[in-house]
Amino acid sequence: MAPQTKIDRSFSALTPALSEWIIDAVDAMGFVKTTPVQHAAIPMFMKNSDVVVEAVTGSGKTLAFLIPIVERLLREDAPTKKHHVGAIIISPTRELATQIHTVLSSLLKFHAPSAAMLEPDDEDTDMEDADTPPKPTFPPGTLKAVPQLLLGGSVTPAQDLSAFLKKSPNILIGTPGRLLELLRSPHVHCPQSSFDALVMDEADRLLDLGFKEDLQKIISRLPKQRRTGLFSASMSEAVDQLIRVGLRNPVRIAVKVKARATGEDGKIEDKRTPASLQMSYLVTPPSHKIPAMKKILSSLQPQPQKSILYLSTCFSVDYFQHVLPEVLQGYDIVPLHGKHPDKVRRKNFNKFVDSVTPSILLTTDVAARGLDIPSVDLVFQLDPPSDPKTFIHRCGRAGRAGRRGLAVTFLNPGREEDYIEFLQVRQTPISPLTTPEITVTDEDAKAVTSKIRKKVREDRALFDKAQRGFVSWVRAYSKHTASSIFRIDDLDWTELGNAWGLLTLPGMPELKKWQGDKRLGIELDLATYAYKDKAREKLRLEELERDKEEGTKKKQHKKEDREKSAWTEQKESKATKEVRREKKKSKREHERLAKMTDEERKEEDRVQAMIEQMRKKVAKQEAEDADFEGFSD
């Protein structure tokens, strides 16, 4: 057998050759060689080919489309005309769009003309020192790449248009809605002579979030003669439909990881996650999950600096962000979910990314796709995702770009263990967590539950958050797509209450038939349970006093109300019966008339006329009798 030829995966070995400044840029960014997806996609996209790229999470898709876009724009015969667009990159989320823009800006800092456009205008900055070097200038015909980020929620569409007219960017990056807003302006032009490339990143996510109509409208505004790249971690029927509409004879690139099976057959099987990522599961009761997570964090060497903990709902995040610091001491807990205002989301995301101390991002699926969080060591899934497709995207936050990572999914004993086989069928095999070896005792679980409850007792606001979060979690669990595995009827409510550190189980339909202790063996006087916030506590006490006064009045009028109610109900009942009787009578009469022949109906009309005539005669006689006052004396 002939020896295999070693492939040169350096960026300088790509064909067509990359510009020297691009090679310098990726080298400075720490990328020594191309990933498989970059090695396959960059040459094809730089040529005149549409590409459909299916690659595992964390495979370097972002540079795989940014490098070709920049190279193509900077190799044009003339610079892009003013207010003309050369390329558009569509992202499903604001966070992902922001990261794409950040990576592109880092790349363009190595191209002097483009880097000059990234700097703020002189009028937007304070007066500079005399020693500050002047801003470099370039001839009018100099080619450059100028990006603009378009995000809903942060600035208005009018501000986006103002920035576009001022800077005249030729690369637009944003979410579908805000991109479409800008493209509708008569001042924004995408003619065939200028427009070069369209990229749809995380295409399946774009469709899952309901952006199909916006995507079609964007595509309809672009010239058909263009290069199009569709990048995604998975393919679906909806994505295939988008490919048929938006791409012309695309080159399909599927980059998967090959892993040798552990069975005796020695088969080679495809994996949809990086080889550097270890995906494991731990079967443990609900109240043991947080203690187990604590032991995993303390057992790993070196200590994980960045970890992600996934929960199923926003309200769950709102609750656990307050109680987990009591248990996971030494870690910064950073919350991030879709209901946070845009400024809060950006602030918390940047706080986690820039953190230099051990941190845990507490989040929902808003961070499961596309977010390029560097150096994530560990991913926990306290709740398996409701959509199985999301599983690999959650796990894929760790083990990116060849870095070793660990993803641990917690499962309840019993039916939930079927989830393991469920994932294997979908080419996502997971193995039991053996390293580190974790053992949690009932005493460990009780100690953690006690700490959480102690924290919750300090402030009634946490009690409210716990109740709301638990109800939202139960509803999310009941809507799991793998409903045969995740069943409400199989839940141990006492275990769950202890796992959450609840002081009492909330009143909800799922617990109506449950015969257990909803107070969880805890004494709690809600009348004296106070809010830490003085204004909120004052309002609660006022409402409590008002309820007491209304309760006294209700007792005084209870008997009277009951008597009135009984008499009223009796009268209403009689009237209701009378109305019902009349309706039945009318219905029977209608049915009787409907069955008559024409002759019978004529006879009926004649009889009714005679009866009516007789009624009038009798009524007239009664009126005359009423006027008669007797004989005079």
From Swiss-Prot:
Residues 119-131, 624-633 have a biased composition (Acidic residues). Gene3D superfamilies: P-loop containing nucleotide triphosphate hydrolases (3.40.50.300). CDD domains: DEADc_DDX55, SF2_C_DEAD. A motif (DEAD box) lies at residues 201-204. Residues 547-581, 588-623 have a biased composition (Basic and acidic residues). PROSITE patterns: DEAD_ATP_HELICASE, HELICASE_ATP_BIND_1, HELICASE_CTER, Q_MOTIF. GO terms for cellular component: 90S preribosome; nucleolus; nucleoplasm; preribosome, large subunit precursor. It is found in: Nucleus, Nucleolus. ATP binds at residues 55-62. Residues 119-140, 547-633 are annotated as: Disordered. This is ATP-dependent rRNA helicase SPB4.
